[in-house]
Amino acid sequence: MGSMIRENKQQMSDLYTKIANQIAGELPKDWTNMSVGFLVDESGFDTYLIYYSTDCGKSYRDFMEEVFDMDEPAEGVFEAKETCLELREVCKKSRDVWTGFALRVNRLGEFSADFSYEPIASFTPMQLRFWRGRYLK
């Protein structure tokens, strides 16, 4: 990202922190790493991914699969999706129209954010496998 950022850096950082905090509040207490993905295809359909690790990133679990099996709704997960949409709108206003966003966070609060700009016609298992291979390490 570096000097390529056209958006307000503090606003962007605040949104990253908000997303991380919204999701962290829903994860198991022993989480060590999380990776959040938000991908948008050409039709505007979005895919939302959340993976977490309890062993410092050696293996990851698909939190979205767990969310649908919970007795109580994981409100923070759905709030974070809304924050991802807000992030996308902030970027669009600066003519920074990305198709993919990834946020990686560890338990210490260290994070990295990455954006991709390749057009996505529609989501395929191969694209999701590529995303997991890139951001779950």
Features from the language model and the residues they span:
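Short amphipathic beta-strand/extended segments with alternating polar/hydrophobic composition
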Residues: 51, 61-66, 114-117
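Acidic, proline/glycine-rich low-complexity IDRs
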Residues: 2-3, 102-137
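Short, non-transmembrane amphipathic alpha-helical segments
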Residues: 17-25, 80-92
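Short, hydrophobic/π-rich interface segment
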Residues: 67-87
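Conserved aromatic-histidine-acidic binding/catalytic patches
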Residues: 7, 11, 72-75, 91
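Short, surface-exposed linear segments at secondary-structure transitions and domain or protein termini
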Residues: 56-63, 70-74, 121-127
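N-terminal domain-start interaction segment
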Residues: 4-5, 9-61
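Short glycine-rich, low-complexity/disordered patches
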Residues: 29-42, 90-106
